[in-house]
């Protein structure tokens, strides 16, 4: 079974407006914006909490940090802007400080084709292939999908 799913999305206008306050120093509304989601299949259902879930989440968080830093570095070395959302804070990793956040259960993910389920006590993201057994990380860039950066990576 596949453990990593990397998807490249062209940001629709509505999503550009929704995320513009995440990047106050960038004009993401009027310029091209692509979103790369790294979806890692988890062993555990991420809708609940247990020591096993917490341990797996921490491991996947470290893997995402490593992958996101590498991909952002490659994009920047090719002349593109890129940043990723720190899943632990919901804020851009490299960007200017902002009070705006985007956690993995944010409604904005619906605009990328994910389901956000309200379980009453909390919300959880659901992937069409992995269901609730998923950890999702998000990278933003001004690189167009035709650059092939995701295919090479």
What would you call each of these model-derived segments?
Residues 1-153:
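Auxiliary alpha/beta "docking" domains used to position bulky ligands
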């Amino acid at each position: 079974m596949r453990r990593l799913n990397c998807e490249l999305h062209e940001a629709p206008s509505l999503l550009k407006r929704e995320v513009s306050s995440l990047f106050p120093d960038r004009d993401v509304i009027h310029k091209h914006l692509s979103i790369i989601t790294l979806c890692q299949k988890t062993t555990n259902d991420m809708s609940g909490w247990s020591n096993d879930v917490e341990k797996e989440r921490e491991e996947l968080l470290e893997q995402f940090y490593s992958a996101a830093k590498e991909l952002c570095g490659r994009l920047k070395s090719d002349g593109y802007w890129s940043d990723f959302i720190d899943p632990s804070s919901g804020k851009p990793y490299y960007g200017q400080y902002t009070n705006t956040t985007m956690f993995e259960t944010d409604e904005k993910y619906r605009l990328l084709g994910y389901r956000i389920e309200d379980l009453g006590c909390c919300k959880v993201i659901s992937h069409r292939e992995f269901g609730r057994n998923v950890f999702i990380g998000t990278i933003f860039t001004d690189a167009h999908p035709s650059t092939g950066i995701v295919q090479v990576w």
